[in-house]
Amino acid sequence: MSRALRRALLVSLAFIVVAVAGRARAATADGPLGKVRRTNDRIMGLLRKQARSPAGAKPIDRELTRVVAQFLDFPELARLALGRHWEARSATERQEFSELLRQLIERSYLKQLRSNLNYTVRYLGEKIVGDQAEISTSIEVKRKGRSEALVIQYKMRRGTGGWMVYDVITDDVSVVRNYRSQFNRIIQRQSYNALLEKLRRKLKDPA
């Protein structure tokens, strides 16, 4: 996975694993910001519990996976990431691809959740148009005595499961576009099956 994509994935969970500062437009409990805050509370509670009881890490990791699955729209993310190649895939192939991508993203997220990074987040605004929403934030990432400011936008849509994130844009770099560019290049130069094999090998790599 490219450095740019790893960086985008890293910051894509920043706002739900940190203390949030600043002010944003008032949000309803069922709105996108409300969803973010509820997820933040749950994630932080689980992380505090895990820190107090390392022996119970596996059950907590399973719960973290469940919470993330309720927050990230994996089917939509997979469809957008595969782009024009999605239509050529059968229902079984789509399900297999979506599951591989889900496992990779969840593993990456859980790795970052355990990394003890220090973030400060400010909400800059919320824009809702019908069933689509965009939340803009500014994040200061602190690690090993260094700070880096990033502008993060979260693309969300409202479906049967409520508001869910389907893309994260970091300093104008989209996670979905990064995936789509990489996947399309592999498919064009090799094949769709070659892409699946690369994803499977990535899952076998140590987390």
Residue ranges and their predicted role:
Residues 20-28:
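Sec/Tat signal peptide C-region and signal peptidase I cleavage site
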Residues 5-10:
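N-terminal export leaders
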Residues 107-148, 199-207:
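Surface-exposed, charged secondary-structure patches
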Residues 11-19:
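Bacterial N-terminal signal peptides
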Residues 101, 125-127, 139-141, 154-156, ...:
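A mature extracytoplasmic/lumenal domain signature
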Residues 149-177:
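Short beta-strand edge/turn micro-motifs at domain boundaries
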Residues 167-207:
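Low-complexity, intrinsically disordered terminal/linker segments enriched in charged
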Residues 29-109:
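Early exported N-terminus immediately downstream of N-terminal targeting peptides
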